[in-house]
Amino acid sequence: VKKTLIPSLVIVLLVFGVLISGCAPTNKGGAGEKVVEMWVMPNSLNPITDIEELLKPFEAKTGIKVKITSVDWGAGWSKITTAATSGDVPDLGQLGSTWVSAITGMGALEEISQEAIAQMGGKAAFVPVSWQTTGTEGSGKTTAIPWFVDARGLFVRTDALKKAKVSVGELASWDSFKNSLKKLYDADLVLDGQPMAPLGVSGKNDWNVIHSLAPWIWMAGGDFLSADRKSCVIDSEESVKGLMFYLGLVKEGYVPSEYLELNTAQVSANFNSGACAMYFDGPYEIKTLTRPESEGGASTSPAAKNFTVTGYPKGPKGRITFVGGSSLAIFKQGKNKAAALEVIKYLASKQAQINYAKATGFLPARVEAFNDPFFAKDPNRKVFKDAVFYGRTYPSIPTWGLLEPILTRRLGIMWDYVLGGKEIDPAKIKDQLKLAKQEVETILSQK
């Protein structure tokens, strides 16, 4: 699942498709039966079946039937905007967290009342960073409820560390992380007959470009937009410093240059097969490594027998990771909005959150769900639990959907500088960031 899941989720973010789409709703049921049309993305190997199983207790108790439509990733943006403008919408839909503000700006989403939010425990019941994306920043209105969360950590081959005489604790800061990579490189690792590179990262062809680079920008003290959201600050010295550190790991040979042609799924497969000792990914990789091949997992892979997870190494401004995920929203022109709200309340409840996290490999958006032993007692999952509380997301503004592709393209060009020449020129990095700033501010000025 992981191989197609998160990559797909991030693809949607990058190609204007983190939303949902599908066929027209048909709110027809038996006599007196309430049918809620719900559009979702394939969040698991069996997306419709998994949600149908999750909803069985709800349907039995309420008599509300939920009709699930799983929507393809690529055409999401055009389909949802067409649906929103035509009125041919479902009652309820899954929205990628960074797109809630854009669809809210179109006037397509129903505001969720404070009374309903209070019935779900209030905003304090949800992971703070996920609540930041439940409406347009500064509007005071909520148009979506967090459903699940995605954060990232560092997956590590423990046997590789042992052979290179490196401890997990030595991966805790930028400097010690870099020194550890050198030790792994100098060890000239070969495990089970497989040569092993110290680190695996994806390059500009990946859907994760901005999500992979953002933590290093943030940890160096950089950012994308000013606090008032009126200007772009990506060209700061701090941003350059963060990018130079991360790109430098490849330039120094700790990442094979051919990895820069790979996407996240391919790097993940390399880690699982033993081709690299470390790489950054989300909690769904734990599900992959603990699930049998017959169910799409890799539980018999070399990595499955010898892995642990730790957080990002701390930078000058601390440890920060990117946090994404999805929310649930009701469409204004939906036919069963009251029933759709009841579905949201159920899916946002503690046990439903735990059950869906187990089915998908994602993280719950509800804070109390993390108290379940599945997260609290598993040291690897606990790393991701911690990450959602120190992580960040992007500004929840309607124009972010236009800004992200610009930033992705400009940041992707950085990898060309890694492949060309002997040294990475900070001036060239800054030039690209200045171009990004100009393009972003052109969009911001049109608000």
Give the residues covered by each predicted segment.
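Long, aromatic- and glycine/proline-rich binding clefts that accommodate carbohydrate-like moieties
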Residues: F126-T136, A304-G311, A357-R409, I413
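Conserved C-terminal helix/tail region of periplasmic/extracytoplasmic solute-binding proteins
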Residues: K65-V66, K162, Y390-K447
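Hinge/lid segment of periplasmic solute-binding proteins
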Residues: S97-G153, D192-A197, V209-A214, M219-G221, ...
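Short, solvent-exposed loop/beta-turn-alpha elements that line the ligand-binding surface or hinge
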Residues: E110-F126, A197-G203, A220-K241, R291-K305, ...
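Short, low-complexity disordered leader/linker segments with a strong preference
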Residues: V1-E37, A60-K61, A116, K434, ...
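Extracytoplasmic "Venus flytrap"/periplasmic binding protein-like
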Residues: E53-V129, K162-K165, A172, A269-N270, ...
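Extracytoplasmic/periplasmic substrate-binding proteins
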Residues: M41, E53-L54, V100-A102, H211-P215, ...
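Helix-loop-helix "hinge/cap" segment bordering the ligand-binding cleft or interdomain interface
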Residues: K56, G63, A116-I117, T136-S212, ...
